[in-house]
Regions:
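Extracellular/periplasmic, surface-exposed regions of secreted and cell-surface proteins
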Residues: 1-224, 287, 291
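Conserved small-residue
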Residues: 161, 178-282
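Glycine-rich, aromatic-lined ligand/substrate-binding cores of catalytic
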Residues: 279-294
Length: 294
């Protein structure tokens, strides 16, 4: 179970369906955080201007039935940690029956926040028979709740800390054509195209991590499952074997025909420093669809 509390305020203004304004304010509390960081304030504002409602527009371009520009800017919060009550330590019984601390409390944990901005244009032609929507968006997520990097010498681990940030941006395009034939048959055709990128801006990683093993600065791929050695082909000759060092710089358990691992960083030995990220694209940068309605 998870307990939270929220207070929400919302106000809208609409003048002649032409000038639009909306403001939202949320004050939200979560049991994940200590009393000093329990509540977060998350405001947002949105404005819109339907230019096609102006008399000069309808007179000059009667075929251009809709032209609306809108913009929104606001923040949202997340308390999605890997476990509950981050400000409490947890204890367990060790192998000799003693009660010991196994996870240290994080009393400074706070809300993960995301600032989202969107600039949109809505277009309609021929009494909205043909329409398009275009949205440019970006999101900066900060104070992400992540597992901390800790030395195994500590003997315990800590609960999630606010240690990451990620940026997302892109464009969404939608188009639709709707019509009715002379025989009363209605149909519509539509498409959607989306382009986006998620990039990790900040990520807590061990000191001296090689650049090719880092998450920070790379596109976010949820399918990145870890690190692995890179296949360097097969041992094809005796010279090939004698030129291949292991993690100690020596040669062992090696014979013709078996595969070898690549000395990725070219330091003269094959070790954990040659591990490379296992990656896959779980969130494709380009998505699209086409639909027909009758």
């Amino acid at each position: 179970p998870h307990r939270g509390q929220a207070f929400v305020f919302r106000a809208t203004y609409d003048y002649a369906s032409k000038y639009l304004f909306e403001v939202n304010m949320g004050y939200t509390g979560s049991e994940q955080f200590s009393s000093k960081n329990r509540y977060g304030f998350f405001p947002s504002v949105a404005v819109g201007y339907v230019i096609s409602k102006e008399k000069f527009w309808r007179k000059a371009m009667p075929w251009w039935s809709k032209m609306k520009v809108r913009y929104s800017d606001g923040t949202v919060g997340s308390d999605n940690a890997s476990e509950n009550w981050l400000y409490y330590s947890t204890y367990s019984k060790n192998s000799v029956g003693l009660i010991v601390e196994d996870k240290a409390a994080n009393t400074t944990a706070r809300w993960e926040t995301a600032r989202k901005q969107d600039l949109g244009i809505e277009l309609g032609f021929f009494k909205d028979q043909l329409s398009f929507n275009v949205d440019l968006f970006q999101e900066l997520r900060t104070d992400m709740l992540l597992k901390p990097v800790e030395s195994p010498l500590l003997g315990i681990t800590s609960k999630d800390v606010n240690s990451g940030s990620m940026k997302k941006h892109g464009i969404d395009i939608e188009g639709k054509w709707r019509s009715t034939t002379s025989r009363g048959f209605y149909y519509e055709l539509g498409f959607m195209l989306g382009l986006n990128e998620n990039r990790i801006v900040k990520y807590d990683e061990p000191v001296n991590t090689p650049a090719y093993q880092k998450w920070e600065g790379t596109p976010y791929k949820a399918a990145r499952t870890g690190l692995e050695q890179i296949d360097g082909g097969y041992f094809a000759s005796v010279d090939d074997i004698h030129g291949y060092p292991n993690s100690l710089g020596s040669i062992d358990n090696t014979y013709l025909g078996i595969y070898k691992l690549l000395d990725f960083n070219a330091d003269g030995r094959v070790s954990n420093l040659d591990l490379h990220a296992i990656e896959g694209v779980a969130y494709p940068p380009i998505v699209g669809s086409f639909n027909i309605g009758l």
